[in-house]
Amino acid sequence: MGVPGHRLDAMFNPKTVVVVGDKGPNYMWLQNNMPFKEKGGNLYSVQLDAKEIEGIEKLGIQNFTSMADVPGPIDYALVAVPRQVSPFILKDLIAVGANGAGFFTSGFAETGEELGVKLQNTLVDMAKPANFNLVGPNCMGLYLPKVGVRFNNDAPIADDGKIGFLSQSGTHGIMFSLVAGANGMHLSRCASFGNAVVLDVSDYVDYLMQDDETDVIGMYVEGARDGRRFFETLKEACKRKPVVVWKGGQTSAGARATMSHTGSLASDQAVWEGMMRQ
């Protein structure tokens, strides 16, 4: 059912998913999302490289060489292209009115490189004015077990999940979904959001706290870009359902690791603990 009217609702309940830039021989992202197609969703590929198109079509996936040719509204795209190409893909997605996209592509501000920072700022400057729902970059994107959208080929498909999980780490997102599923605890929705340059943790919490398919919210967070908003959103969420927060970067070594991992700046631990107590 989701949260009709919420800016993230189409992305969390997609009817059309597009994988951009997948490559053989495994075609990981298309293979991960085959259950979405099998459940009746529209799964398409956008790939310009002629060497890859035959392999994509052998999977039974229709490929397009232009975003403008993809039929119907694009609810969610998974983008796996070199970082220098990312702004061009984002431009095309915005031009066709796509709702949102997860950018698996890394190599942005988390590297500390001038080019990476510049490219990340370019994505932000393009996405925000367009009100485009950019997940990431440097992330695994969405896992929606009820409709068959996955960021890992072993993640279970299940209709009974009631746990919403958010993770700034792709590895933690994958491992939690696998371990939880192996122990009979299925997820309702999961987002791995990496650098969180447009959509921040607060945006996902705001959705999950209103989602009647989610009874409890768990999260792994390395940092919030707007601490006050995160506090207010978390406070409201806790009135509605249980929330479990796992904070990364709590030591000096951990803080350095999160900076190089997702570009998250360390926050004062006492301030963080005070916020959690409130």
Describe the role of every protein-language-model region.
Residues 1-278:
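Catalytic-core regions of core metabolic enzymes
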